[in-house]
Amino acid sequence: MAPVGVEKKLLLGPNGPAVAAAGDLTSEEEEGQSLWSSILSEVSTRARSKLPSGKNILVFGEDGSGKTTLMTKLQGAEHGKKGRGLEYLYLSVHDEDRDDHTRCNVWILDGDLYHKGLLKFAVSAESLRETLVIFVADMSRPWTIMESLQKWASVLREHIDKMKIPPEEMRDLERKFMKDFQDYIEPEEGCQGSPQRRGPLTSGSDEDNVALPLGDNVLTHNLGIPVLVVCTKCDAVSILEKEHDYRDEHLDFIQAHLRGFCLQYGAALIYTSVKEEKNLDLLYKYIVHKTYGFHFTIPALVVEKDAVFIPAGWDNEKKIAILHENFTTVKPEDAYEDFIVKPPVRKLVHDKELAAEDEQVFLMKQQESPARGPSGSPRTQGRGGPASVPSASPGTSVKKPDPNIKNNAASEGVLASFFNSLLSKKTGSPGSPSAGGVQSTAKKSGTEGEPQSFRSLTEQCCQTGQKTVLSNVQEELDRMTRKPDSMVTNSSTENEA
């Protein structure tokens, strides 16, 4: 079918119509070709457009809060090595519509404030507009959350001020961020939009999207860049309920303060758990949504107490006030640390109970204990005698409470018997004029006709158990024997004369 313009030309006459129709046909073809060329050019331009590079994620958090483990999990690695100072890794981003890949830089600052000067290597004045900030809070230690968030927010604010960004440029960043916060539109239920398709998610015309005024406590600390508050280790909520008697009121109080902080900075709030892999996919999608503009179709989640998600721009003070209705023992204006109290530390008492004696001291005591006598007196040993000699009395025991007194008395008795027997032996020999008197004395002492040898005396001494007497008895007997012999010889000579 010929174009309408050509049909009108044919009605003009028999000569000119053919020429006119050919000229109009050529112009129409050129117009069509230019239209197709513009369409193809636009498509090819979009196809050649790549995901922007140079995007940064800056992560703050205390030591042990799980920030490195969280980002390593988002990266797809199973185990990450803990660094020192300023850690670096990257997230792989894939645009399925354009089959394009890029990498998003991730900088993790050490939990020690000593390393905050390293931020200048991660974010500069030129790269600030391409940066997203993540504050990591440890839900297993909720009493540290608010203090930690305030501390790291102050560190970031101080770093931005040191960049000396021109005031007009900083105001542009703040206005753009405030507009994004106000233009938030909650995704409709059943929305089937591709989460990878790039572009703003809008509904209706621009005239319908009227920016609502901000509340009194909303965006009071506008940093000009998107902020994300991520609570890690949310699986510890059950432990808090069992060990620290946390109730729903405590959890609502914590959530209310977190959402209040997020309102001040225009931040989003996400509860995560690497252990249970909870909300990790949601966190990744929200990050690429805020950094690369991918469509995001997940609404706010406030039902589950350990899987909360509050996107930036959704919350307000009236929604937070719903949590206040469940407060019974605390008021919304009460200080956070007055209700979420740090549990007492019982480490000192625990260490005192487990204190052990030094191994070397214990071995020294064990080495010294066998050397002590049964009653504490030092042990003495005879010349060749045994270590202990039983007493002659069958009814007495070897160990006595105080054997010194009895041993001394026995020693004196042995010496007296020895001297008497010695005198009776020497003076009672045949031919002695005084033999009768001496023998009578010997009879009284019960030693007549029974000469006692040194062996019998030694055996008698052994029966007493006195090692001191045993060791010196031989010398004493020799000395005493020589002296009475001389006395008896002199006495016999005088009698004969």
Curated annotation (Swiss-Prot):
Modified residues (Omega-N-methylarginine): 383
Record field: transmembrane: none
Tissues where this protein is expressed: Ubiquitous.
PTM annotation (Phosphoserine): residues: 194, 369, 377, 429, 432
Phosphothreonine modifications at: 427
Region (Disordered) residue spans: 187-206, 366-408, 423-461, 474-497
Binding site for ATP: 61-68
Positions with biased composition (Polar residues): 423-444, 487-497
Comp. bias intervals (Basic and acidic residues): 476-485
GO CC terms in record: centrosome; cytoplasmic dynein complex; dynein complex; kinetochore; late endosome; microtubule
Biological process (GO), any one: cellular response to nerve growth factor stimulus
Coiled-coil stretches noted in the UniProt entry, renumbered to this chain: none
Places the protein is found: Cytoplasm, Cytoskeleton
One Gene Ontology MF term: identical protein binding
Any Pfam family hit: DLIC
Keyword Disulfide bond: no
Record keywords, A-Z: ATP-binding, Cytoplasm, Cytoskeleton, Dynein, Methylation, Microtubule, Motor protein, Nucleotide-binding, Phosphoprotein, Transport
Biological function: Acts as one of several non-catalytic accessory components of the cytoplasmic dynein 1 complex that are thought to be involved in linking dynein to cargos and to adapter proteins that regulate dynein function. Cytoplasmic dynein 1 acts as a motor for the intracellular retrograde motility of vesicles and organelles along microtubules. May play a role in binding dynein to membranous organelles or chromosomes.
Record-stated family: Belongs to the dynein light intermediate chain family.
Quaternary structure note: Homodimer. The cytoplasmic dynein 1 complex consists of two catalytic heavy chains (HCs) and a number of non-catalytic subunits presented by intermediate chains (ICs), light intermediate chains (LICs) and light chains (LCs); the composition seems to vary in respect to the IC, LIC and LC composition. The heavy chain homodimer serves as a scaffold for the probable homodimeric assembly of the respective non-catalytic subunits. The ICs and LICs bind directly to the HC dimer and the LCs assemble on the IC dimer. Self-associates.
The protein's name in its UniProt record: Cytoplasmic dynein 1 light intermediate chain 2
Lineage: Eukaryota, Metazoa, Chordata, Craniata, Vertebrata
